[in-house]
């Protein structure tokens, strides 16, 4: 499976709807994303668009963005697989909930709920 990992801190959520059939949103710090990508089910990681990446052990990973509250990423599994997406959705669900709890904000919590609702609609 080819997995594209894109930091999307500067991409409007509305623009992501263009990818709605084959993408996932993940919120987490870099080390959390790194742990997800080390899963045996994820074979390869490649860059997309013009973001800067660096090479580590023959795999491409996004340059960590230092942010105390976490980083928002877009994961695009290709080809689209319902089973794969369900597994990644479960991971996304947990990370987004943890992220929302850490921020302890109604606005952030609502954003997390919106992201999860959107994922549910697209993937399940």
Curated annotation (Swiss-Prot):
Q: Which UniProt keywords apply?
A: Membrane, Transmembrane, Transmembrane helix
Cellular compartments annotated: Membrane
The membrane spanning regions, by residue number, are 83-100
Its membrane topology: Single-pass membrane protein
* Record's GO cellular component terms: membrane
Is the keyword Transmembrane in the record? yes
The miscellaneous comment for this protein is: Partially overlaps IES1.
**What is the protein name given in its UniProt record?**
Putative uncharacterized protein YFL012W-A
Gene source species: Saccharomyces cerevisiae (strain ATCC 204508 / S288c) (Baker's yeast)
